[in-house]
């Protein structure tokens, strides 16, 4: 019996981490995870066939999410990382219900905590998809930790298609981002949460358009949360380090 338990723990440690997003944006999370947990295996699902999610109905997002989670569970993952803000905002509870006791990490929780740790003026801006903004998920997550913080959210529905197109430094993307940033900058924010995993790919452009504003990339904080979960669950490296 003890030997079986030891074998099961060993097998569990060798299983991969499942990461999923509506498209290529979640690869920013994968990169951060690989840097923070270099010995872990990762299974990534990017739903490029049905991107963008941010303009779809709640029911559609929940259906697509259930299909993705089922696929990852069939691949015997040991933890799930919701690398899509829209999914985290709309279907996070569904993911956790399907996962059971499995650790589930999401970018909104990590992003909210990072923003609160970063802001000096308690004026935080959030750029996100329309669905994420309408869900009020970031404001709720931030206010649950500090109700005195002012949160200004801006829907940016055109940015995901531009990133998926590869127009990371295109003039059209620059002009579009500039328009989205105007109300946020007018609100005198000092911290800006990139509330979609596609947006970190635009960091050079956004830094140029919003100088002096600290950008919060939730991919980095999500990776740190995964590392803490790995420590608590005593995950072992899934691969041997190169000699």
Question: Residue spans of the language-model regions?
Answer:
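Non-catalytic structural scaffold of enzyme domains
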Residues: 2-243
